[in-house]
Swiss-Prot record:
This is Recombination protein RecR. The gene is recR. Residues 81-176 form the Toprim domain. One of its GO terms (biological process) is DNA repair. GO terms for molecular function: DNA binding; zinc ion binding. Keywords: DNA damage, DNA recombination, DNA repair, Metal-binding, Zinc, Zinc-finger. Gene3D superfamilies: 3.30.60.80, 3.40.1360.10, 6.10.250.240, RecR Domain 1. PANTHER family: RECOMBINATION PROTEIN RECR. It comes from Alkaliphilus metalliredigens (strain QYMF). InterPro entries: DNA_Rcmb_RecR (IPR000093), Rcmb_RecR (IPR023627), Rcmb_RecR_Znf (IPR015967), TOPRIM_dom (IPR006171), TOPRIM_RecR (IPR034137). SMART domains: TOPRIM. The keyword DNA damage applies.
Length: 199
């Protein structure tokens, strides 16, 4: 039995589609939005639409940006000789919080996961290889999450890059196995970056 009017039920359904949002949280969010002033609700709705319309992938690193080239790739002070390969745009934010890494990034937008039907072709590995052919670098740091998918992805990329003669390293495991970079604190990430090992 549905206790809500159709617009409220629809709003709850939409919120519950978001990752990590269960039915109860979706209900709380829906009621919060309804209790907001009309102007605030409109700002929220417009900012979602604006982000959806204007955000695209950087043509160099595939990070999210509202420009053709993101702020990191266009920064002349960043080391272009070192690329840190990560799974997700949120990991760029996590790494940047450390203020330790001064190179550039390459965002895969996923990790190899045969059980979920995600192979190397479904993530941005091909784009990484093309980038390295066009602009050779001294080192590639593999900063995948320390879980089975992250390890498989790091090993796969490492095997592809070793014959090219590029130094390939993996961040150290100060990060718990099964954890996500996004949730690691700055000190842990800094130490993991410092303690990276060649593979």
């Amino acid at each position: 039995m549905n206790y809500y009017s159709a617009p409220i039920a629809k709003l709850i359904d939409e919120f519950s589609k978001l990752p990590g949002i269960g039915r109860k949280t979706a209900q709380r969010l829906a009621f919060h939005v309804i209790s907001m002033g009309y102007e605030d609700a409109e700002k929220l709705s417009n900012s979602i639409i604006e982000a959806k319309k204007s955000i695209k992938y950087c043509r160099i690193c595939t990070n999210l940006t509202d420009k053709e080239v993101c702020n990191i790739c266009s920064d002349p002070n960043r080391k272009k000789s070192v690329i840190c390969v990560i799974e997700d745009p949120r990991d760029v934010v996590a790494m940047e919080r450390t203020r330790e890494f001064k190179g550039q990034y390459h965002v895969l937008h996923g990790a190899i996961s045969p059980l979920e039907g995600i192979g190397p072709e479904e993530i941005n590995i091909k784009e990484l290889l093309i980038r390295l052919q066009e602009h050779p670098v001294e080192e590639v740091i593999l900063a995948m999450n320390p879980n089975i998918e992250g390890e498989a992805t790091a090993m796969y990329i490492g095997k592809l890059l070793k014959p090219i003669g590029i130094k390939v390293s993996r961040i150290a495991h100060g990060i718990p196995v099964g954890g996500d970079l996004e949730y690691a604190d700055e000190v842990t990430l800094s130490k993991a970056l410092e303690g990276r090992r060649e593979i």
